From Swiss-Prot:
Heme b b562 binds at residues 83, 182. It is a multi-pass membrane protein. It comes from Lissodelphis peronii (Southern right whale dolphin). This is Cytochrome b. The gene is MT-CYB. Heme b b566 binds at residues 97, 196.
């Protein structure tokens, strides 16, 4: 008799996705981050659900409701910090996952890649509206600064900003709708992740060599389930260490001051995972130009498959491209550092140079070096 997991309509879907899925035999730990992202998403939805049971999305009580969660709710402090630091772990996994895709040429699965870019944007939107909810100083001013960027859109900008605010400034209506967005978006992310997986399983996984591995596949379970569990243990260990030893390491002290529209913090900055984009935004002295650069810094990922000039898919055997890839990583780390610094000399010029290098690397240097490598292979 055939096993129920292969015949039952629901079990069959799970079986084909996680158990009998043919997987390349040589994929490395860099392929672990997809499942870790799934784990992060589940953790964020669960901790978020329990936080939502005690949180009140109202300007007069939001800040004190978060304090109440930390002080009075059983293990409320733990749930709150798991949720806050879980977001950081989510973005670490997300950036590693994208970096893997860039390095090994996974972007050649175009539908999977484009859904992935859409997922990135949705996760960023979720994290942004979530940061506003505690209604501290950085929540309020972060929301004010970032939503205000839309006013750079010609003709409809101001109307659009006031429509999003639900008034003439960030206030009660803004907080309520941001809470609604923050609640619904993770479920949209879950649906998109399912579509992402659907498209991936149409083609099968890529592997470090970038060479088709159809003749050398192994079942996902038990070989990769056990590897994924190891990765999950590392993730949980790191998250628990962060949450229990230094819960505020990645947060901003300003967010422990209740939101006050009459007092602007000295340095308005987003959470660490947005600093690279914030640095690119600030490096351009023109408002509209900055907004366009900010958008392009993320949306440039959509154009990566079109910029592929190499005859080889992966960078595994391309040392010059590898050098440029790691230069790009170093550049992004530099931008992240600059985004957290005040707007003064020498940070301004360093940020501008790093921003120029970011676009120059992706749009010009990498495609050119790939062409040179093609020529070298002919020798």
């Amino acid at each position: 008799m055939t096993n129920i997991r292969k015949t039952h309509p629901l079990m069959k879907i799970l079986n084909d996705a996680f158990i009998d899925l043919p997987t390349p035999s040589n994929i490395s730990s860099w392929w672990n981050f997809g499942s870790l992202l799934g784990l992060c998403l589940i953790m964020q939805i669960l901790t978020g659900l329990f936080l939502a049971m005690h949180y009140t999305p109202d300007t007069s009580t939001a800040f004190s409701s978060v304090a109440h969660i930390c002080r009075d709710v059983n293990y409320g402090w733990f749930i709150r910090y798991l949720h806050a630091n879980g977001a950081s772990m989510f973005f670490i996994c997300l950036y590693a996952h994208i970096g893997r895709g860039l390095y090994y040429g996974s972007y050649m699965f175009q539908e999977t890649w484009n859904i992935g870019v859409l997922l990135l944007l949705t996760v960023m939107a979720t994290a942004f509206v979530g940061y506003v909810l505690p209604w501290g100083q950085m929540s309020f001013w972060g929301a004010t600064v970032i939503t205000n960027l839309l006013s750079a859109i010609p003709y409809i900008g101001t109307t659009l900003v006031e429509w999003i605010w639900g008034g003439f400034s960030v206030d009660k209506a803004t907080l309520t709708r941001f809470f609604a967005f923050h609640f619904i978006l993770p479920f949209i992310i879950t649906a998109l992740a399912a579509v992402h997986l659907l498209f991936l399983h149409e083609t099968g996984s890529n592997n470090p060599t970038g060479i088709p591995s159809n003749m050398d596949m192994i079942p996902f379970h038990p070989y990769y389930t056990i590897k994924d569990i190891l990765g999950a243990l590392f993730l949980i260990l790191t998250l628990l260490a962060l949450t229990l030893f230094t819960p505020d390491l990645l947060g901003d002290p300003d967010n422990y001051t209740p939101a006050n529209p009459l007092s602007t913090p000295a340095h308005i900055k987003p959470e660490w995972y947005f600093l690279f984009a914030y640095a690119i935004l600030r490096s351009i002295p023109n408002k509209l130009g900055g907004v366009l650069a900010l958008l392009l810094s993320i949306l440039i990922l959509i154009f990566i498959p079109m910029l592929q000039t190499s005859k080889q898919r992966s960078m595994m055997f391309r040392p010059f491209s590898q050098l440029l890839f790691w230069t790009l990583i170093a550049d992004l780390l530099t931008l992240t550092w600059i985004g957290g610094q005040p707007v003064e000399h020498p940070y301004i010029i360093v940020g501008q140079l790093a921003s120029i290098l970011y676009f120059f690397l992706i749009l010009v240097l990498m495609p050119t070096v790939s062409l040179i490598e093609n020529k070298l292979l002919k020798w």
